[in-house]
A protein has these predicted regions:
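Bacterial N-terminal signal peptides that target proteins for export
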Residues: 1-9
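Extracytoplasmic
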Residues: 41-43, 57-59, 65-67, 77, ...
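Solvent-exposed strand-loop boundary residues in beta-sheet-rich modules
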Residues: 52-54, 95, 174
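Short N-terminal segments immediately surrounding and downstream of signal-peptide cleavage
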Residues: 23-42
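Gly/Pro-enriched, hydrophobic low-complexity segments
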Residues: 120-122, 127-209
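A short, Trp-centered hydrophobic/proline-enriched beta-strand micro-motif
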Residues: 36-54
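An acidic-aromatic
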Residues: 61-113, 178
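N-terminal signal peptide c-region/cleavage motif recognized by signal peptidases
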Residues: 18-20
Length: 209
């Protein structure tokens, strides 16, 4: 099960069509709007569907609390959990009682979870045919091993920065592609810090020996 989560956090979005773009705002303006959204968003909850390169579909609920906290609560039969505590991302596989952990800054998700990150240095607006859609590709050219993330936003009055995150695609250095689609997004909802706690399966495994 590890491989399904690894591509998501160690790493051209189907949410937008690769057709000729209509007249749109400048790339700098687009990056500014996205940065404003990420800085304005205190919390977000959503349902998600995740598809990997092999076509396997997993679903669950996503919770974000800025800065840096995130939780992917997968469907029960997946036995998988991904949690970010503000500093590190942890992938817990309850099926095999394994845990992996690494800095958020080493993941494509840093673009989403670090609202102070300068997108003008790492981001590039990807043209779309819909003027209400913004797509940004974020990568660190000095750290290709961190992968690439392409996020898609749509205009939504009343949302933070008047934008709504619709999903993203992450691509790691081994070309493993993971697509996330979001629905039922809610902003500014109360989220306790305990939401980002998790149970270490290795303790239970050791106690059985």
């Amino acid at each position: 099960m590890f491989k399904y989560g690894f591509a998501l956090i160690a790493a051209p979005l189907a949410l937008t069509a690769s057709l000729p773009a209509t007249a749109q705002q400048s790339p700098a303006d687009g990056l500014s709007k996205i940065s404003n959204h990420l800085r304005s968003m205190s919390t977000m909850t959503a349902n998600f569907s995740q598809t990997d390169r092999g076509g396997q579909l997993l679903t669950g609920t996503l919770t974000i609390k800025q800065p840096g906290k995130i939780r992917f609560q997968y469907q029960k039969d997946a036995n998988l959990l991904i949690v970010g505590d503000g500093k590190a991302l942890t992938l817990i596989d309850y099926e095999v009682n394994q845990v992996q952990r690494w800095p958020i800054s080493n993941s494509p998700l840093a673009a989403l979870l670090n609202p102070e990150r300068d997108l003008s240095k790492y981001g590039k607006i990807i043209p779309t045919r819909n003027p209400d859609v913004l797509s940004v590709e974020v990568r660190d050219p000095k750290r290709p091993e961190y992968g690439v993330i392409t996020m898609v936003f749509t205009k939504r009055p009343g949302a933070p920065g008047a934008l709504k995150l619709d999903g993203w695609v992450s691509l790691d250095s081994k070309n493993n592609r993971t697509s996330i689609r979001l629905s039922n997004q809610k902003f500014g909802v109360p989220v306790a810090n305990s939401t980002f706690n998790w149970t270490d399966p290795r303790r239970k495994s050791r106690s059985k020996r």
